[in-house]
Amino acid sequence: MPRSSRWVNQRATSKIKKFILFLGVAFVFYLYRYPSSPSTVEQSSTSIYNISVKDIEGKDVSLSKFTGKVLLIVNVASKCGLTHGNYKEMNILYAKYKTQGFEILAFPCNQFGSQEPGSNMEIKETVCNIFKAEFPIFDKIEVNGKNTCPLYNFLKEQKGGLFGDAIKWNFAKFLVDRQGNVVDRYAPTTSPLEIEKDIVKLLASA
């Protein structure tokens, strides 16, 4: 093999090794930042209807209130690049199916890029006045780490994600059937209207 070709091959091999090393370091960093917590999973509820959350005004809400309904549960943020598209499509779905037993439960979260920095009242004003949301908005929560709210411990236990259970970004979505089973989990980049067919299928189920 000519010396120049051998040099090119060695250089390409070196780049590949560096890239693989970079991926490995990035993956380890991700696991370190958002580790799974066995003790937290053990403490999670056996039913979504046994869990209580707080609404945007700080009042306790038992999720048993939503028994028999199809739920789309979303961690939301007001200043994300995904915000406008998601709220627009969630509004479409809610208007279309709310009378058929469909609910969207939106949980503000500031853990991703600090894109939900406001107080609960500021969030409520933004969501209701700018994004025109009519579905329930709840108290700002954490979805990863030691302060993860019980609901998200339960959701992640029921439906793990790619490369670990941690929520990866704003607007991750969980779909819950009428019996309270977490039937699917969707990436933040999955638009609400892409989920419509799955929602319709669950609404048609007894």
UniProtKB/Swiss-Prot annotation:
The cellular component terms of Gene Ontology attached to this UniProt record, alphabetical and capped at eight, are: cytosol; endoplasmic reticulum; endosome; Golgi apparatus; mitochondrion; trans-Golgi network
Q: Which family does it belong to?
A: Belongs to the glutathione peroxidase family.
Q: What does this protein do?
A: May constitute a glutathione peroxidase-like protective system against oxidative stresses. Involved positively in abscisic acid (ABA) signaling pathway that regulates numerous ABA responses, such as stomatal closure, seed germination and inhibition of vegetative growth. Oxidizes and represses target proteins (e.g. the phosphatase activity of ABI1 and ABI2) when oxidized by H(2)O(2), probably after ABA signaling. Modulates the calcium channel activity in guard cells in response to ABA or H(2)O(2). Confers tolerance to drought stress, by enhancing the ABA-dependent stomatal closure.
Mechanisms controlling activity: The redox states are modulated by H(2)O(2).
User: Which organism's genome codes for this protein?
Assistant: Arabidopsis thaliana
As recorded in UniProt, its EC number(s) are 1.11.1.9
What is the official name of this protein in its record? Probable glutathione peroxidase 3, mitochondrial
Q: Which residues cross the membrane?
A: none
- Cystine residue pairs: none
Q: Which reaction does it catalyse?
A: 2 glutathione + H2O2 = glutathione disulfide + 2 H2O
**Which GO MF term does the entry hold, naming one?**
glutathione peroxidase activity
User: What is a biological process (GO) this protein takes part in?
Assistant: response to hydrogen peroxide
InterPro entries given for it? Glutathione_peroxidase, GPX_AS, GPX_CS, Thioredoxin-like_sf, Thioredoxin_domain
Query: Primary place of residence?
Result: mitochondrion
- Compartments it resides in: Mitochondrion
**Gene3D superfamilies with a match to the protein in the record:** Glutaredoxin
**Keyword field contains Transit peptide:** yes
Outline the subunit composition: Interacts with ABI1 and ABI2.
Entry's induction text: By osmotic stress, H(2)O(2), drought stress, and metals. Regulated by abscisic acid (ABA); down-regulated by 1 mM ABA, whereas induced by 60 uM ABA.
Enzyme class per UniProt: oxidoreductase
Gene symbol of the encoding locus: GPX3
UniProt note on tissues of expression: Ubiquitous.
Phenotype upon knockout is: Leaves of plants lacking GPX3 are 1 degree Celsius lower than normal plants, whereas leaves from plants over-expressing GPX3 are 1.2 degrees Celsius higher, probably because of the impaired evapotranspiration.
**Where does the record say the transit peptide is?**
1-12
Organism classification: Eukaryota, Viridiplantae, Streptophyta, Embryophyta, Tracheophyta
Record's keyword terms, sorted:
Abscisic acid signaling pathway, Mitochondrion, Oxidoreductase, Peroxidase, Stress response, Transit peptide
Active site, per annotation? 80
Share any extra remarks.
The reduced form of ABI2 is converted to the oxidized form by the addition of oxidized GPX3.
